[in-house]
Amino acid sequence: GLFSKFNKKKIKSGLFKIIKTAGKEAGLEALRTGIDVIGCKIKGEC
């Protein structure tokens, strides 16, 4: 019925938010690691 439809939408948007946040966190972590690697390559300290 109407309630289950609304509930599914809520669950979907909740999951989407979690995935988006997790993706952002993972992306930032990868970016930081990449910057560190590039930095040490420039300095020749890898």
UniProtKB/Swiss-Prot annotation:
GO terms for cellular component: extracellular region. It comes from the Eukaryota. Keywords: Amphibian defense peptide, Antibiotic, Antimicrobial, Disulfide bond, Inflammatory response, Mast cell degranulation, Secreted. Belongs to the frog skin active peptide (FSAP) family. Esculentin subfamily. This is Esculentin-1SEb. The keyword Transport does not apply. Disulfide bonds join C40-C46. Its main location: secreted. Expressed by the skin glands. GO terms for biological process: defense response to Gram-negative bacterium; defense response to Gram-positive bacterium; histamine secretion by mast cell; positive regulation of mast cell degranulation. Mast cell degranulating peptide. Causes histamine release from rat peritoneal mast cells in vitro. Has antibacterial activity against the Gram-negative bacterium E.coli K12 and Gram-positive bacterium M.luteus NCT C2665. It is found in: Secreted.
